[in-house]
């Protein structure tokens, strides 16, 4: 990971006006470049397809993009699972049936991605894959009550982590979003309007985030040179003697 950090008189510049939705206060922007965010021994799309039909007994068959960049992630269309893509935590985390449905879909996705060899292993592999759903852009209201207009974003993304809808978006999942958005034909790319892209701004429960990627195709294989996103500088701990 390459971090571009602003320095002043040999010290990190912490104060700034860059604001990440979901973080309590603004700070100096730090640009991150995730060099080769896909393990060379792994396929970016482990099934070999940009979009698969994911069969989940008792629930249905869903179009899914399964990707390993950043963190293994399963992307679904929000409309296919009965959502708009503008949902907040309270809309999903209090619905035990919905959470169980997401977990079953995630388990079958893990099996199809080759991350597990038996469905029973999914219970002890909660960290990956993540499951997320996407939708075309529209006006929405964040968890803090902020109004975001459709023309401020390219698409909506909501993601679950450890069987709960995340309050914003996980950093590693943001890498997956950025890479998937920049590959023509994935569900993420199509939700953002399709076509060639180098970056997208997506809406999440706490606001918006811009992510991107540099990708090339060699001998039929997608190669991710880097994924990009910004974070903010902030003091985690300070001690004085």
How would you label these PLM feature ranges?
Residues 1-241:
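Non-transmembrane, aqueous-exposed alpha-helical and coiled segments at domain scale
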